[in-house]
UniProtKB/Swiss-Prot annotation:
Residues 1-19 form the signal peptide. This is Gallinacin-1 alpha. Has bactericidal activity. Potent activity against E.coli ML-35, L.monocytogenes EGD and C.albicans. Residues 20-25 form a propeptide. Keywords: Antibiotic, Antimicrobial, Defensin, Disulfide bond, Fungicide, Secreted, Signal.
Amino acid sequence: MRIVYLLLPFILLLAQGAAGSSQALGRKSDCFRKNGFCAFLKCPYLTLISGKCSRFHLCCKRIWG
């Protein structure tokens, strides 16, 4: 029974961190507004990461316009 008291704060910290995690990700429309495009896992050559479209999709932007 003593371990429950030790685990409770840890569980509460995990729940608190997971509460706002979905808001941290951007959306496709935000990426397109920044003149970018969504790419799976990594951006192509001569592009930079400018954000996230979803968990596995990055928002990429071309280096030269």
